Amino acid sequence: MAQDEFEKLPEEGQKKKKKKSGCLIALIVALVIVLALLITAALGLNYVFGKLGRFENPVQGGETISMLPEEAETDPAENVEGLESVDASDVVFETVDVLEGDVVNIMLIGQDRRPGEERARSDSMILVSLNKERGTIQLTSFMRDLYVQIPGYLDTRLNAAYRYGGTDLMNETFKVNFGLEIDGNVMVDFDEFTEIIEIVGGVTLDISSAEASYMNKRSDNHFKAGSNYFNAEDALTFTRMRYAAGGDYGRTDRQRRVIMAIAYSLRNADLVTIFNLIDQVLPHIVTNLTDAQIIEYATTGLGILANGGEIGTFRIPQDDAHYNANIRGMAVLVPDLEMCREDLKEFIYD
């Protein structure tokens, strides 16, 4: 071998070492970047979770009672005129099996706090069901005047369960009556929806002529039957509409429609919009979901929306699955629970 060839060998070895050294540096830099991103993500999640409120259970000492104060059941404005009087003992509830399926059920609770009350009734109860297999998000409103069995208490209105025993009793009530396993609860004040709607830039809703007439009496903007743009203030008025355009049934339907409109608006939301939502809205939300559950369910829900998944709406009870009655001075809806459970199974699970 020539002398000049011998002289080249160390130089080639040095190049290999330099190449290996360069790869190692690149790997270290990549690891540092990944670590920095993970730390940033963790700090961001801690910031997000720190904004949320948390439920406290149990309430009122957790005592089991068989009688409720009269004022706890009846409303001063109760109107039972024309309703059939039914003895409470004539309404019989049976034990039911829990509905099963790969579905996440989250109960969205809207509050109705009255003066002097420590805990409000659940004014609105909307079940958000994430079905990954079907790629759908289903919203089910439960009428607050449903007459149901509440474990440890007299049978009474569904919306009393949260006031008497918080989310624990509320979830148990849904389980024994409707066979629903609730995975978590999120409580919001529908008044706070104005902030959400302002951040997403308003919503577009299809409304009826009766709804348009109601809105025109209460808004500076003009509404017509069909598609209309709603700013935050008008959307709040729309969700509160009760004594017109369908009464309480119409009100729960309007709440679902506004939630759907917000969800569709979030499909294409940018990072600035999402950050504003986190910063301004989360402080008004209370939940018993763990941090891990929030990440999992939010990822599932956003994934369904991003893939063009459908959002369906439903109401319990359906028109043919209940009758109106006067029980102990309360105007209530007595449900056919078997029909209700069949409807829920078909809408959410099948």
What residue ranges belong to the model's regions?
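Non-catalytic, solvent-exposed segments at the cell envelope interface
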Residues: A2-V29, L37-D350
